[in-house]
Structure formats: structure tokens, C-alpha cells
Swiss-Prot record:
This is 3-hydroxypropionyl-coenzyme A synthetase. Disulfide bonds: none annotated. The lineage of its organism: Archaea, Thermoproteota, Thermoprotei, Sulfolobales, Sulfolobaceae. Its EC number is 6.2.1.36. The active site is at D525. Keywords: Acetylation, ATP-binding, Ligase, Nucleotide-binding. It is an enzyme of class 6 (ligase). It comes from Sulfurisphaera tokodaii (strain DSM 16993 / JCM 10545 / NBRC 100140 / 7). It catalyses: 3-hydroxypropanoate + ATP + CoA = 3-hydroxypropanoyl-CoA + AMP + diphosphate. The modification N6-acetyllysine is found at K616. Belongs to the ATP-dependent AMP-binding enzyme family. Plays a role in the autotrophic CO(2) fixation pathway. Activates 3-hydroxypropionate to its CoA ester. Can also activate propionate, and to a lesser extent acrylate, acetate and butyrate. GO terms for molecular function: 3-hydroxypropionyl-CoA synthetase activity; acetate-CoA ligase activity; AMP binding; ATP binding.
Amino acid sequence: MTEKLSEQLQQLGEQNLEEKADYNMRYYKYLYKKSIEEPDKFWGELAEELITWYEPWKQAFVQEEGLLTKWFVGGKLNASYNAVDRHLNSHRKYKAAIFWESEKGEKKVVTYQDLFYEVNKWANALRELGVKKGDRVTIYMPLTPEGVIAKLAVARLGAIHSVVFAGFGAQALADRIADAGAKVVITADAYYRRGKLVELKKTVDEALNILGDKSPVQKVLVYKRTGTEIPFKEGRDVYFDEVGKYKYIEPVPVEATEPLFILYTSGTTGKPKGIVHSTGGYLVGTAVMLLWSYGLSQENDVLFNTSDIGWIVGHSYITYSPLVMGRSIVIYESAPDYPYPDKWAEMIEKYRATTFGTSATAIRTLMKYGEDYVKQHDLSSLRIIVTNGEPLNYAPWKWGLEVVGGGKVFMSHQWWQTETGGPNIGYIPGVVYLPMKSGPAVGFALPGNKVTVVNEEGKETKPRERGYLVMLPPFPPMMMIGMWNDPDNERLKKTYFSKFPGIYYPGDYAMIDEDGYIWVMGRADETIKVAAHRIGAGEVESIVTSHPAVAEAAAVGIPDPVKGEAVHLFVVLKVGYKPSPQLAREIQEHVRKYMGAIVTPEVHFVDKLPKTRSGKIMRRVIKAVMMGQSAGDITTLEDEASMDEIKKAVEEFKKSLSQ
């Protein structure tokens, strides 16, 4: 919580509080109303308080007609200075900025003083390689402190980074390098993931070979992560330890509206979308939501986030906002359940994390192992569990609250996207605790975010009437400022503003209940149409995972000559349960009980579901296998064995039909 906000909260309580039970909701409504009615003043005060500026802005925001919002126009700052330098003249100088561990037991503690030293080394190396303001640098790194440092070094020079998730293959990497026009690629020789060596430099070489003479890359800067022998191209490839010498590099001031980074969304077909985030607005918006929605409002708060630096969460809530606000982050270079199921709990206990950030799928994965693993650890430091990336159904919500949090944590579920940069719907436990609701109920529109639900005609829906989630301008500061290589905004308009002109449509299905909570039901394009009824895949999965035997589930719609689409469920059971026809019937009845006879799913038991390495279930892959089609881009697939599981289940289903 900021100082001004604390004062306002106290004043409001003294003046307006009539019933103590209503206090928190009253304050949320007051704060939200203020943010919507006076967005320039609301965000302007926060920007002054939280961020260090070289030059003040001339205009708080400029709303492009029918498009996006530009914030803090005319202001100048540097992201690296805000995340590093400004902490050195305070008590934070020797405070831990990063706690890091690998799956092999390697450990590092990086203080803010260390961070300053390392960022300058990397910035000096990049400058020696010719990187200057406005250049693009592709970062293809594992989840290490060096991956975070590389981002800050690029930003220090006023250049633009484009981080590519280390799980992507050569073609996906090549596409992103080419689209960004990257002058330099930063990578590591290799790293370990679930005990297997992943050779990153080899993939970079393959990507550049694909591009051939069309490659924009002049240099490849290689960090020796494992010491693995790698191919080396003289004149192009450079080892970091040969050029990474310390020299103070003055942070380059940039306009608040200039790009800080490009982050490509992982579409299944077509050209990847390069989402561009600004420097000023992005730093302000993400910092505010770190304090409010992630709840890191106290100086000694520690954030353990299981995301990756290649995703937007890894930009906003592993790299920038925690460091800008001088907090400590915990990062683990592997899956949270490797090499043993309670590794994540061990990390929380060891580093006394106060906020644990993860996905609903990750929680469901951990649930499979039971409660005993969790109970071995003292997790009393936790105040808040943050989940995002997909709908959170009841079972993982309850497990997180009761098993992980001992009934004492706040479950801060959020909705946001790569495009929006930070949370737009959820709770603000860093300010006040609002009553929690479980299931697909995400929470409320967060301050500064005009979020609602509309029908096909673009009119606001009634309570509990399903429709389309939309955002109205002015959009919050951390939201994207455009798409790379889209100078006339044609692709931007077609992708986000064509369904409802002037209104941002992210593609999700939602409703608002009678208490004002927004329920996000999942992607509109994942809606299953059964006998003229629109059913969200997430709705079905929420009900299925409330069955005591079910750990995880994925629902997909398959064309059916009678119903239009039939619901097929792929179910992972908890430890101690075994697949059987009787259990399949139980699960079917469980779904029928809550959703009616129209939704009687076919149940397929599998040991694992295909997921991305960020923990999202790849429903399109399941559907493709079911229909005998190509699975498309599966470079982010965590475990290819999960594909075999689906294929096996489909074959067994087909055999049963022929018997």
C-alpha cells in the first residue's frame, strides 16, 4: 500500500464507516470510482510516488480514437535505473533481490548491490557488441538470475528486448528473431529441465540457419550455464565471460511511451503477434498491481513465482515490478514438482515467501501427490496465493486455501493477458481483503480497469447472463501500446477491436453475478455447443474436479451428428484411485447432477494431460488428436508422453464403439 493510499484509507474509515463488516467493500468501491472518474489524477499520483523520472510528463494520457491509450506522454525515465540504481542509496543496497535455485541444488543470492554490478557488466558487453537505443535484442535464456539481468541490461541501453521462451523450438525462435529484427541474440549453452539437458545454443544455431541470409542477427552472446560443449561460429558468437567486464554504464533516458519490450504470443497458426509494452505506463501499472493485487505491500515481502521469464508473468512479476519496488523474488529453474513433489513447498519454507504465484493447473498437478508432502513444511510465512492464466475451479481453490494456506491465506485469483501487462480483474489484498468467492469467479474489476460483460449487440448483460468480457477506454497504463510491425494498426484493429468497435475484446466468455463478481468461463473459442446450448470447457472442468477422485480434467467438444458437439472428458485421477467403468459412470452422473442430462460426457482416463510449460492445458492438442488432425505448434509442450496418453485413450474409445 502506498503512503497516500494509507492516509485515504484511514480518512475514509473515520468519515464513512458505519458498519465494520462493510468497510473493505466500501473502500474498494471508493477507490474504483475515483480511478474511473479521474484516471489522470489517480494514475498520476501513483506514478509520482512509485517511479523515478528524469523529466515529468506533459500529459497524463492520450486516448487514441477507437484504439489504445498512451500514458505519461512527454515523461522520461529508465527501467533499469528504477529497478536497480535507485535502491543503492537506501537500506536495500545489501538486501536480497533474487534467491535462485536449480534442480541440481545450485544456489545464488543476488543483492541489489550485486544486481547493479552484474547489470552494468551485461550492459557494457552489449554496448561493445554495438547495441544502442532502439535496437532489438532477443533473449533466449533459462530461468536464471542472468535471464533477469539480461533484460535489465538491454533496458539500461534504451534498447528493446524480446524474450523468447526457452521451450520454443528453432522455427518459432527464427520467426520471432526475424519479426523483431534482432541485432543480437543472448542465450546460454544449455540448462537442465527434469534431469534432461536442453541445448539452447544449438537451437539458436538452427534458427539462424533457417533464416540464412535474411537473418538480422550480427552477434550471439553466449552465457556458460552448464559448460556444455557447443558449436561456435567465429566472428558472430561471443562468450559473455570474454566481454562481460564491469564498467559503469549510464542509464539512457527514454520517453515513457517508447517500447520497453516486445513479447510474442504463442498462436497455433499464422504469424506470431509481437505485443509491445511501453516503458513508463508499464512500470507504473505493474508496480501498483504488485502492491495491491499480489499483496507485496510490505518492505520485507518475498514473492515466489513459478512462471518463466519468457512469459508475461515473468516480465511483470518476476523481473520488473518486484525489483522496481525493491522486493525479493524467488526463482526456481525447473518444474515446481521436480525432483520431488514438495520442492515448491520447500522453496516457500526456506525463503519465507509471503506471496506464492502460480497457475490453477500447477496447483491441480501438486494436488495429485496428496497432502502429506505439504504438511512436512512450515508454510506459515504465506499470506497470499496468487493464481492466473486460466480459470481457477473450486477444488484447487479449496486445496490452496486449506492445505497450503492452513485456512489463513488469501486466494488472490486474477484475470489478465500478455496484452494487458498486469491484473485487470481480481482482488486487492495489499489494500483491503474483499470477500472471496471460489470457482470461475475471478473477483472484481481492479481500480483503473473499466471491465464489463456484453452480449452480441454490445449491450451490458444482466446479472448471471453470459456474454463477452470486454474492456473500455481509457485502458490501464500497463496495457500494450500496439503490435510490432503493425504501423497502421490494421492487425491490432482486426484482432482486438473488430467485434465491438472502440472496445477491447480479449476473446473470453464471462458473466457478472448479483454481487458484482466477474466470472470468466474460459476462451469463447473453447465454448462447447451442445444441442444449441453454449457450455464453457472451464465450467465442465470445474464440476469434474470437484469429484473426490479427480485431480485434473480437460473438456473438449467433438462434432456430433445429433447434438452438434459432444463433450469428451480426459481425466487424471488422484493417487489411490484407479480407472474403472464404474468410476467413469460416477463422474458422468456427477456432471449430470450439476449441469443436466444434456451434458453427459464421454470419460477417458489418462495419466497426464498435454500442457505448456507455463502449466496451461493444451485443449486444442487434445481435440486435434481426437479428430485425427495435426496438433499444430507443440514446441511449448511440457511432456510429449502426454500426447501418447491422449492417443491411447482415443484408440480405446474407438475400439469400444466398434464392439
